[in-house]
């Protein structure tokens, strides 16, 4: 069995008093997802999450707290891989979703209360639900 570790972020910003979340579109724009990626050597999971949010979504956040881990299995070259993705909650500090990098098709703001319905992956929908329940208390 192979294990892989990644990290990602739910970055929240208020517009007109309502919380919005930075999300990215991948796979020719057909999949709405959270920014995430592999943990680089010497990087903590929280540092990776902040970097991935900055690179993929074009925005910079302040770490609020860890939201949780998403675990799932997949096959690679005939071997089972256990993937663990640690997600962190961030509050918006600066930047624009127009400044996303080439790894994603686009980045956008999504109303946080709609994110659990719109995100493509179950684990990420759960992280958005957790962020929705915690964001009011956190900021």
Cite the ranges covered by each PLM segment.
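N-terminal strand-loop-strand
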Residues: 1-34
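Conserved hydrophobic/aromatic beta-strand scaffold that supports enzyme active sites
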Residues: 10, 23, 87-89, 109
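Short, charged/polar surface micro-motifs in flexible loops or helix N-caps
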Residues: 16-18, 28-31, 40-41, 69-71, ...
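Short aromatic/basic micro-patch
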Residues: 33, 82, 109
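The catalytic Nudix box helix
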Residues: 34-67
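NUDIX/MutT-family hydrolases
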Residues: 91-131
């Amino acid at each position: 069995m192979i294990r892989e570790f990644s990290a990602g972020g739910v970055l929240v910003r208020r517009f007109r008093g309502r919380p919005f979340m930075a999300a990215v579109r991948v796979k020719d724009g057909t999949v709405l997802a959270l920014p995430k990626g592999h943990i680089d050597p010497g990087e903590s999971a929280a540092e990776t999450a902040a970097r991935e949010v900055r690179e993929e979504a074009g925005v910079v956040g302040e770490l609020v707290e860890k939201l949780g881990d998403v675990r799932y299995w997949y096959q690679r070259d005939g071997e089972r891989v256990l993937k663990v993705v640690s997600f962190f909650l961030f509050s918006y500090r600066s930047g624009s979703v127009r400044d996303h990098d080439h790894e994603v098709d686009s980045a956008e703001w999504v109303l946080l209360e709609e994110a659990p319905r719109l995100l493509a992956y179950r684990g990420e929908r759960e992280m958005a639900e957790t962020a929705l329940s915690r964001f009011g208390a956190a900021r």
